[in-house]
A protein has these predicted regions:
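C-terminal catalytic domain of photolyase/cryptochrome flavoproteins
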Residues: 1-190
Length: 190
């Protein structure tokens, strides 16, 4: 929130974190800070970003509009453990790790084929750190229609993502307690 309210500048954050050293975590943090600034630049120069595809050729994409699928995604009841954990964490805490944000966004847009606006609007309503510029640019990135988008055919496989980033199942089980007794080898295989 300190960046959001201008209590500290991105330059100050960059410099202070650079003084820590040059490890992978600092470099990753700098990339995220740069993405934040890039997103703000985009929104300033393209104020329609929250409502229109940056890449206009996606305006004709045949998005679905299944309200039941959207409700399942929003409530964390898709049957896909890592997706359900992320969506329940979002609802319960107002937070979600960036990797899980990408997984649930990819699932909404690439697996359920629901318009990225639905996800953007839900994140805006639920995230404690909601930011219009980041939210809009990130959703378009995942959906494949943004300025620096992931290719439309890039899909985050929620099964392998769960196995890779929650290999012990600790995160998933924390938010999907009905899977507490599920053996690890079956946890991410819906």
């Amino acid at each position: 929130p300190h960046l959001h309210w201008g209590e500290i500048s991105p330059h100050q954050v960059w410099h202070a974190s650079a003084c820590i050293g040059k490890d992978d975590d600092v470099e990753h943090f700098h990339r995220e800070l740069a993405w934040r600034e890039f997103s703000h630049h985009l929104l300033y120069h393209f104020p329609e970003l929250p409502r229109r595809n940056f890449n206009r050729k996606f305006d004709r994409f045949p998005w679905g509009d299944d309200k039941d699928l959207l409700a399942c995604w929003q409530s964390g009841k898709t049957g896909i453990p890592i997706v359900d954990a992320g969506m329940r964490e979002l609802w319960q805490t107002g937070y979600m790790h960036n990797r899980v944000r990408m997984i649930v966004a990819s699932f909404l847009t690439k697996n359920l084929l629901l318009h990225w606006h639905h996800g953007q609007d839900w994140f805006w309503d639920c995230l404690a750190d909601a930011n219009l510029a980041n939210n809009s640019a990130s959703w378009q990135w995942v959906a494949g229609c943004g300025v620096d988008a992931a290719p439309y055919f890039r899909i985050f496989n929620p099964v392998t993502q769960g196995q890779k980033f929650d290999s012990t199942g600790e995160y998933t089980r924390a938010f999907v307690p009905e899977l507490d007794r599920m053996p690890d080898r079956f946890l991410f295989n819906p």
